[in-house]
Regions:
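Short, surface-exposed beta-strand/loop "edge" segments at domain boundaries and coil↔beta transitions
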Residues: 21-25, 69, 94-97
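A short, structured active-site edge motif that brings together acidic residues
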Residues: 83-94
C-alpha cells in the first residue's frame, strides 16, 4: 500500500563547496566527477543550478526515488574532510531571477 509513495521520485538540491585544499586547476574535474557520481546514483541527468566563478561552490538539482541517505553516503565518500555539502528536498518553485535553466528544470519535473 504505502510502497507506491516510497517509489515516487522526489526533487533534491545539493550545494557543494570544495575545500581550499583542491588546487584551482582540478576544480572543474572534481565538480564534473561529483555531478557524474550523483547522476549515476539517481539514474538521471543532474541539472547544474549555479557555479561560482572558480567552480569551488556549485549547486545542482536532481530527481530520484532512491533513499536520499544512499546518495548522501556516496557523496560523503567522494568528498574530503575540507569539502562541504548540503542536500535538501525541493518543493514548488516560488520564483526566480536570472536562473532560467534551473527554474525550467524545476517546472518540468
Amino acid at each position: 500500500m504505502g510502497s507506491s509513495m516510497q517509489n515516487e521520485p522526489k526533487r533534491y538540491f545539493a550545494a557543494i563547496r570544495l575545500g581550499d585544499d583542491v588546487p584551482p586547476d582540478q576544480l572543474g574535474r572534481r565538480v564534473e566527477g561529483l555531478r557524474q557520481l550523483v547522476s549515476n546514483l539517481v539514474k538521471c541527468d543532474v541539472q547544474l543550478a549555479f557555479s561560482s566563478g572558480d567552480e569551488r561552490f556549485v549547486g545542482m538539482f536532481f530527481q530520484t526515488a532512491r533513499d536520499i541517505q544512499i546518495i548522501r553516503a556516496e557523496l560523503d565518500k567522494a568528498t574530503t574532510y575540507f569539502d562541504r555539502f548540503l542536500m535538501c528536498e525541493v518543493g514548488d518553485l516560488a520564483g526566480h531571477k536570472g536562473m532560467e535553466v534551473a527554474a525550467t528544470w524545476l517546472q518540468h519535473r
